[in-house]
């Protein structure tokens, strides 16, 4: 039965295990929500605004179905966009987006209809009637979200995180420090960003010393607002020792507008990653590394819509073990590090790294891997090579508040089924299975990130 009680649960032990974890609170250490939207607490106007307006998963699949861009990110009305989505939605079967959006519809709206061209109008009208009462803060409480960490630039004032402590009840909203723009000396706009950091923190960032001082001040500012982790997007990690004089020369050259060599770019990035590690060591933050996303791969999309619009891909030609070796050994026993990989063929590398370094953790199945298939493969492999007990928990990685419940439910069902299979095969006792699914679903990530 579609989305029935046994959805994704194929054995009796799995049903029992899921029933024990399904109502646990949600702790999400990595997502892309905007704290401003939560603080302002404005209800959504329609189902497209909730499900499609910010979700590049939806955009990509609509494009795959031949839908014109004007019905995705263009000038068409939200209703026209929803109707266009519903028309092709049956083609989404097998993709987790099909299940997530139906779970949203069934669990949050209590509308148990299958999305199609025939039901699109009814769903539009029914959701429109219910949305005025479904504010962001109410939804977070209804979904039992206990803690969530947004992803924020070091230049941010964090004013909405500060306000959230005053006006948001029952949910803790924390920032995450993401200094990618500081490190990416090869990207357009780097100098302007460095100058902005100088203005924000009162430092002369034309010098390396001034820039590092601004970053330290930013780090402290985030700490004061409850930050517990940093996050770093790395296509291919390449961290090694770089002398500060070398980094200073590259910084000054880049700031003056001169073109850098690839070696200079690599050296600067390696140097900065070590500085970020030292900062996190001071505050005992968790360091999250998201590895392997080749971003903005489709040029025409990036030129017209910018980043995070559905033009990113996965690639497996990465030297992860070699690139991380210096960083991991430099901070061995000094940092908690969580590794996420986009290509599943890299899972053996990070799982065995975690096995070798007690303070390294394998992150949740990420992005293209957060489907039932990807999750099952991820969990089974991790259990067989490292410790499933030590998985860094589930992250929604979402830009869409409504999906917190559906993404978490899917993960907990898959987890329960994987562990339930072990019980049914006689591999583990039910008592240990119960403790395992509870730890991975809630206790483990809460302890790792939020102590």
From Swiss-Prot:
Statement: the UniProt record of this protein carries the keyword Isomerase: yes
Q: Which residue ranges traverse the bilayer?
A: none
Instruction: Give the EC number(s) listed in the UniProt record.
Output: 5.3.1.12
The reaction(s) this protein catalyses? D-glucuronate = D-fructuronate; aldehydo-D-galacturonate = keto-D-tagaturonate
Q: In which pathway does it act?
A: Carbohydrate metabolism; pentose and glucuronate interconversion
MF terms in GO: glucuronate isomerase activity
Q: What name does UniProt use for this protein? A: Uronate isomerase
Organism of origin: Thermotoga sp. (strain RQ2)
């Amino acid at each position: 039965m579609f989305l029935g009680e046994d959805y994704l649960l194929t054995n009796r032990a799995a049903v029992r295990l899921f029933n024990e974890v399904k109502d646990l609170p949600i702790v999400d250490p990595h997502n892309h929500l905007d704290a401003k939207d939560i603080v302002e607490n404005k209800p959504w106007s329609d189902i497209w605004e909730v499900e499609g307006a910010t979700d590049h998963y939806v955009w990509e699949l609509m494009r795959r179905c031949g839908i014109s861009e004007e019905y995705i990110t263009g000038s068409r009305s939200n209703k026209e966009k929803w109707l266009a989505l519903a028309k092709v939605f049956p083609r989404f079967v097998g993709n987790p987006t099909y299940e997530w959006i139906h779970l949203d519809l069934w669990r949050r709206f209590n509308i148990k209809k299958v999305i199609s061209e025939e039901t699109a109008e009814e769903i539009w009208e029914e959701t429109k009637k219910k949305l005025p009462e479904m504010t962001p803060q109410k939804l977070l409480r209804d979904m039992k979200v206990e803690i969530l960490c947004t992803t924020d630039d070091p230049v941010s004032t964090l004013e909405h995180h500060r306000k959230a402590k005053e006006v948001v009840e029952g949910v803790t909203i924390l920032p995450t420090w993401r200094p990618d723009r500081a490190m990416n000396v090869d990207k357009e706009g780097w100098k302007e960003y460095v100058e902005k950091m100088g203005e924000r923190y009162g430092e002369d960032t034309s010098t390396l010393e001034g820039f590092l001082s601004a970053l330290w001040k930013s780090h402290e500012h985030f700490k004061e607002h409850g930050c517990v982790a940093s996050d770093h997007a790395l296509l291919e990690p390449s961290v090694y020792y770089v002398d500060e004089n070398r980094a200073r020369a590259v910084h000054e050259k880049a700031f003056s507008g001169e073109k850098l060599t690839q070696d200079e770019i690599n050296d600067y990035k390696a140097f900065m990653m070590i500085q970020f590690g030292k900062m996190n060591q001071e505050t005992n933050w968790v360091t999250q590394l998201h590895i392997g996303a080749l971003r903005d791969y489709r040029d025409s999309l990036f030129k017209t819509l910018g980043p995070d619009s559905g033009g990113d891909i996965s690639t497996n030609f990465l030297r992860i073990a070699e690139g991380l070796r210096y960083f991991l050994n430099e901070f061995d026993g000094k940092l908690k590090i969580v590794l996420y990989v986009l290509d599943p063929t890299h899972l053996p590398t990070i799982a065995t790294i975690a096995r070798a370094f007690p303070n390294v953790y394998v992150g949740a199945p990420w992005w293209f891997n957060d489907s039932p298939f990807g999750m099952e493969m991820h969990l089974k492999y991790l259990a067989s090579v490292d410790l499933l007990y030590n998985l860094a928990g589930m992250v929604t990685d979402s830009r869409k508040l409504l999906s917190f419940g559906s993404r978490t439910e899917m993960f907990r069902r898959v987890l329960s089924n994987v562990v339930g299979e072990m019980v049914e095969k006689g591999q583990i006792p039910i008592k240990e299975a119960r403790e395992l699914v509870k730890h991975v679903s809630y206790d483990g990530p809460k302890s790792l990130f939020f102590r």
